[in-house]
Amino acid sequence: MSIVNFGKETRFAIATVDHFINDIAWIGNYNFQVDIDEFFKVADNTNYDNGYGTAYIPVDLMIVFKNGDSLRRFEYDGSEYWKFYPSLTKPTSFRHFKIDKFTDVKYCEKLNEYVR
């Protein structure tokens, strides 16, 4: 059993990925947003067990930063936490892959092996 304060956990996660509260563009999910100050007011008053069991914090909750990076809630085997996702940018150089159909491969680079 590990009781944590959600506000402290969130601030720690933000600092761990070299961001600040004022870097936040929005908090919510793909359909809803919450006021940033209101979010932290509620988070600071929320203590929960982040260990094994059912998820206490919504798993679709995201903090999106102005540069496109994000923190997203993640749950694995009953343990829940923030997971960092860097912003997506187009690579400056890349290799092309051939494709004639999608198969049951896991990665794009493997598609070259299945071109018939």
Listing of model-derived features with the role each one plays in the protein:
Residues M1-R116:
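Acidic interaction surfaces
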